[in-house]
Amino acid sequence: MAVAFDEMNGPEGHLRTAYSELSRWLKETPPEALDYRRQEAELLFRRIGITFAVYGDAEAQERLIPFDVIPRILSAKEWGILEKGLRQRVRALNMFLRDIYHGRDILRAGVVPEGLIFQNPVFRPEMNGQDVPHDVYVHIAGIDIVRVDADDFIVLEDNARTPSGVSYMLENREIMMRLFPDLFARHRVAPVERYPDELLAALRSVAPGGVSAEPTVALLTPGVYNSAYYEHSFLADKLGIELVEGRDLIVKNEEVFMRTTEGLKRVDVIYRRVDDDFLDPLTFRPDSVLGVPGLMSAYAAGNITLANAVGTGIADDKAIYSYMPDVVKFYLGEDPILKNVQTWRCREPKDLSYVLDNLSDLVVKEVHGSGGYGMLIGPAATKATIEAFRDKLKREPEGFIAQPTLALSTCPTCTASGLAPRHVDLRPFVLTGSKHTTIVPGGLTRVALREGSLVVNSSQGGGTKDTWILDE
C-alpha cells in the first residue's frame, strides 16, 4: 500500500496553506485546554442525544458517534474541483436511472451488461416506463470521496438510496462554533447551516404537476427503532415538516393523506427513509408494517413524489459502480472529473482469477453490502479469514467486487497520546431539484480512529469531524 497523503503537512514537513492558521492555533493552545474542550464536546453530544443504533449489539443498542474536534480543512480551489465532479456524477446517475427504466439505450449500446440490471435484486420492474416528476430520481445523494494525493479525489461509493449522516454534519458545525469561536475568527469558513432550507426547496420543487398551493412535504421514517431515527427526527424538525410513520398515512383515490388532529391532509412529497422493500405491502414485501398500503398506486398515478425515487438502489450497486466512468461518458460525452477506484468484477472469470491470487492485498466487498459489513481487508485479515472469503468468492463470485487497498489521506486527530494522523473520507451531500443542483460547501468527514485502520464507518468504530471549506 502506498504512503498516505497527509492533508496538513506536505513533502519534507512543509505545512499546507489551508492548515497554516490551525497549526498556529494548535501551537498556542495548551494540550489540557484542547482536551477540556474535547470533553465539553462529548458532553454536549450526550446532552443533545446524538446516537446511532448498532444492530445485533447486545451490549449497547445506542452509541454516541465519537467526534474529533480537529477540523478537516479544504481550500476553495480543492472544493471547486470536488463540486464540479459531484455535479457531473449525480447528473449522470439521474440520466442512467431514467434510461434503464425507459429506453435502455445504454444496455443496447453494450456499455452495461443487461444481466447486471435485470438479474439485480435492487432493480425494480415496477418502475419500468414510469415517469417521475422532472426526471429526478436521486434527489439526495451522499457520494463517498477519498483522497489519495494533492490532486486526486476518488469516488468510493455512490449512495443513491437513502444516504444518511447529514445531521452529524450540521451538529458538528454547531458544536464547533460553540466551543471554538476563537478558531472560527481566524478562518473564513463557508457555512453549511443553509442545508435544511436548500433541501426543503429542492423537495418542494419536485412536487407533482398540478399542485397549486405550497406543496406539503413529510418525512417517512421506519420508526424509533431504526438506527438513523435521530437523524429523521432532527431533519423533520429543521425542515419544519411532519415526521410520519407508515401508519400515519393513508391512500384514498390514488392520493396520499396524513392523519392530523384536524383531519386528513394531502401530502405531495415524501422524503422517505424507508427502503423500497418496505414501502408498500401491496407491491413489495407483504409482511411490511413500515410502509403505506397503496402508496405505489398513488406513485404510478403521478400524485406523489418519493425522494429518492423507487428503484434508485441499482445506481449505488457496487457492481454498477465499476461502470460509472463509462456511464458518465455515455450520457454526457465527458471524461469523469472524479475517478473511480480500480475495481475487479468477480463475476468475470479473468478478474476472479486475479482476485483469488491476490486476496491478501485487496479489499473485497459485497455488491449489496453497506456500513463496512461483509467485506475483507486483505492486508489486515488473518489467513483463516482470507481462506473463508476465498470459499465465498468461489461459491458466489457475482456477489463481490474487489479493489486495491487505498492509502486514504490522513488528518490530524486527537488521540490518547496527543495529535496523530488518522485516515479519513468525505461524504458531501448533493441535492437535485427541478431546476438546480445544490451542494453545501463541506460534508461529513468520517475518521478511522484506530491507528492504522482504514474503516471509517461509525458502525465499525469510526468517528466524525467538522469539514471546513475556506472562503477565499
Where do the PLM segments sit?
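Preference for protein termini
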Residues: 1-472
